[in-house]
Amino acid sequence: MHEDAMARGRFANAHREGDTVVRHPTADNSGPRALLRHFEAKGCTLTPRVLEASEAHERLSYIPGVTGYPPLTEELRSEGALVSVARAARAIHDLSASFAGHQAYEWHPLETCRPVGDPEIIGHGDLAPWNIVFGGTEVAGIIDWDAAGPMTRSWDMAYLAHQFVPFHLGDDISSWGWDSPPDRRARLALLCESYGGLDPEDVVDDAILRLHSTGTFLRQRIQAGDPRFEAQRHERHDRGFMAAAARLAAYRDTLLGPDPKGR
């Protein structure tokens, strides 16, 4: 059987064996597995199927396609891809809303703070390009559900918006494949409209909070000497997230334009 190490994975030491993926989660993954089984029972084709699971490993179905890593290709920077990721996220969010008994599971989100409000869905928690499988500009699947958990829709979409609108500012935009900044306000509006019923202001404010709290979380783990975060220490991810939060906060009013609520 053909084996292919998936070298870009940070934590689960994943490798492909034919049409399956073998992963070794570092924490109890019973919640995400139950969620994936719920998606399968609902007929969802956007998420991997759980084929085998134990405390030490899990075997999932492989979703063929291409994941996105910076610099993103022209296809993944397109409006078509932006619309597709918004609609795919809406589909899984709607299906997750009917997942009963989530209180029985321990979830492992990466962030240390959340906005005020009751959870609306079981979100993915890390909707970045490298966790989304594409066929051209269309989303073929959403993978790596280890950071899933109860949250609001805008909280999950905030990180997706950061990566796909994108909210990267300054010199950082070129490393993500952009020769010049796109019309972020228009792309944010397109993302929210394609998802349906999503408030751009909530998405931006949640993104600022998410980026800062992620940076704080990473800094705490790095300072604690957690070996799982050695790559993040070497690449200074904590500084990157906190700087991104500060830049986005300064750019907030420009991005949103006149206050739509008239305040």
List the model feature ranges, each with a label:
Residues E52-A56, G101-T112:
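Short, glycine/charge-rich beta-strand/loop segments that flank catalytic centers
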Residues T214-R263:
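ATP/Mg2+ or Mg2+-diphosphate-binding catalytic cores
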Residues A12-R16, V50, T112-D156, P166-H168:
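Active-site acidic catalytic loop and adjacent metal/ATP-binding pocket
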Residues M1-D4:
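Conserved N-terminal boundary motif of the eukaryotic protein kinase catalytic domain
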Residues M157-G196, L211-I222:
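Active-site activation/catalytic loop segments of kinase-like enzymes and analogous catalytic loops
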Residues R8-N13, G18-L95, F99:
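A conserved alpha-helical element in kinase catalytic cores
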Residues P71-E106, P119-G125, W130, F134-G135, ...:
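Conserved kinase catalytic-core helix
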